[in-house]
Amino acid sequence: MNKKANEQYKSNERVILDVFTRLLEEKDLRKITVKEICEDAHINRSTFYNHFEDVYGVLEKMWIIHEENMKYIFRQSHSSSKKENLRMILEYIKDNELFYRVSFHSPIFSKISSGFEIVFISHEISGTCLKEKYEMEFMKQGFLMTISYWLDNDCNLSVDDLLDVIDT
């Protein structure tokens, strides 16, 4: 692919992601259609399908982007404090509240669930023995359901208050 075509490809993908994000602010994920994305993005359906299989594929791509952003935040933080790392994650989630609220109730939730293992693997539980694996899964699921509840309630607790709940 030549440079100009590659730039056009990336530009189309950005437009699709932007339109999708705007539509998420306006309506439920299940009501967003490929046709609507294409019309709002001023692209052909074939262009959409060159990038994504369906609407959930767009959401999945957004998850990949958010997961990379979160990993970047972890790499940039030279903190070994579990509490500080959790604070950074919670702030990132709150800054991207709409995306996470939608994602927690979508088919990509299993990807999100596995993506959050970074929170627990990099700290005191390494998951090397069977008991530790159960402990890690318990903590991860409790963490995710608490985050889901927080998102469903419009992040009505401050990050610090939620951190106190999670870190007890």
PLM region spans:
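N-terminal intrinsically disordered/low-complexity leader segments
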Residues: 1-9
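An amphipathic alpha-helix adjacent to DNA-recognition modules
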Residues: 10-21, 25, 30-34, 39-42, ...
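Cytosolic nucleotide-binding catalytic cores of signal-transduction proteins
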Residues: 24-27, 40, 122-127, 131-134, ...
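Generic structural signal for secondary-structure transition and capping sites
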Residues: 29, 95-98, 125
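Short, hydrophobic secondary-structure boundary micro-motifs
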Residues: 32-33, 101-103, 112, 159
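Hydrophobic alpha-helical connector segments
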Residues: 74-101
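Amphipathic alpha-helical packing segments from all-alpha helical-bundle domains
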Residues: 105-145, 168
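C-terminal peripheral helix-coil segments that are non-catalytic and often amphipathic
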Residues: 149-168
